[in-house]
Amino acid sequence: MKRVMDMWLSSTASLAQRRSQRQPCATAGAAPILALFFFALGFLMPVQAFAETVEQRIARLEPHYTIRRPENASGPAPVVIMLHGCGGPRPFISQMAEAAAEAGAAAIVVNSFAPRRISRVAAFATVCTGARLQGRERAGDLYATMAWARAQPWVDAARISVIGWSHGGWTIMDALALRSGEEMQRATGLENLSDEPLEGLAATMIVYPYTGVGTYTGRRDWRIAPRSTAIIAQRDYIVGSSRAALERQRARGAPMEILIFQNATHAFEDEHAEDPRVRYNPAATAREHDLLREMIAAL
């Protein structure tokens, strides 16, 4: 299996390099047949090559957290955990973290690639095609970050929220849908999870998520029911429309508001995107910031 992956990575390295500035979930790119093949291959490969404790996962993630805390906070503050898309951290996420701090919340930006030594080029070749680090595995990063956040004296553990873009949105919804116990441990590679690792999660914001093959969205009930807002970009030609899957999830009892951003593309917040399918939309970005502030105010 490793030999097959190495051969494919070698043959696609130049293509991935040319796309090094493009945005998450490039599954709909120039080689859809290969992308589909390797997405399917991801289900045949072990989700996690080794098991580790929650504390060990935290030790790997923590050096790469970017934390922005509100100024003049007089006590524990609400928190927004931020999960990037499959292209990795982007400048607009830092801007969202600043907006969260200005609204009175601390922001924890999770970099899921740095501790795994996944470069941006490798991410486009493997994560964006589904061959590596699928949402159910990355859910372990959210579980570990929740555990870390609850232990911080500056965090109000009853007012934790999470926002995820694209692959990050997939991660959030799979994290809510995994079954406690053996399935959750096998999917995330974490050995000592609590019965409910998302305890204290009060709200989510799910932005242009991938909801297709390999996700649990619309196919399973959530274990807990945080207030949720889902943003669909009307002109999303990267992950396609997620409306049907999100509506199925809502029909299963998820308290989710589904918003369609007209004339917005995937990664509409990214001023520096080079992918022709992506267009920066300042009005949509401002609206997203408003929704973030509303979520924080309601915590």
Regions found by a protein language model. Give the residues of each.
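Serine-hydrolase catalytic machinery in alpha/beta-hydrolase-like enzymes
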Residues: 54-69, 76-155, 170, 268-276
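N-terminal secretory signal peptides that target proteins for export/translocation
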Residues: 1-28
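Short beta-strand/loop motif that positions the catalytic acidic residue
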Residues: 230-232
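Conserved alpha/beta-hydrolase "acid-adjacent" motif
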Residues: 237-244
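Bacterial N-terminal signal peptides
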Residues: 32-45
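Acidic beta-to-alpha connecting loop that harbors the catalytic carboxylate
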Residues: 234-237, 263-265
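C-terminal catalytic histidine-bearing segment of alpha/beta-hydrolase fold enzymes
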Residues: 255-299
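Primarily recognizes the serine-hydrolase "nucleophile elbow" in alpha/beta-hydrolase
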Residues: 143-223
